[in-house]
């Protein structure tokens, strides 16, 4: 009976973890595609304090808070939401600055390599957030 209970607890924790990762993926799509296209173009992300770039990062932070609040307490949700927004801003700023400095265009290979790195960094942040939320 004990083994069954342990398996059930592991299953529930794994289901919560996968759900949270899925919700972060949805949040990312909404914020990085739809909201950015509607509210943040042109974003001038290569300018560190660009208002539209800051709004884009705020969308990610608020989205992260909405995703996290059912899974954790208020303070933890706020902390990781701020981490998501700030890290998103720094990642986007870094990518945009490099792309602009190197003069890489949308139809060039290096732009898409930079975008791949950018997206992988964002999702790495999500994995870390989910990991820490789930272990505490």
Annotated model-derived regions:
Residues 2-136:
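Hydrophobic alpha-helical transmembrane segments
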């Amino acid at each position: 009976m004990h083994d069954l209970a342990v398996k059930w607890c592991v299953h529930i924790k794994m289901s919560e973890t996968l759900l949270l990762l899925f919700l972060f993926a949805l949040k990312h799509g909404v914020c990085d595609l739809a909201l950015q296209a509607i509210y943040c173009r042109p974003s001038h992300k290569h300018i560190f304090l660009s208002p539209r770039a800051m709004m884009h990062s705020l969308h990610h932070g608020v989205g992260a808070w909405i995703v996290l609040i059912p899974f954790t307490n208020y303070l933890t949700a706020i902390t990781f939401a701020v981490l998501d927004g700030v890290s998103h801003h720094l990642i986007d700023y870094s990518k945009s600055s490099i792309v602009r400095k190197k003069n890489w265009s949308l139809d060039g290979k290096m732009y898409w390599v930079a975008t791949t790195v950018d997206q992988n960094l964002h999702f790495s942040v999500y994995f870390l957030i989910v990991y820490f939320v789930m272990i505490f």
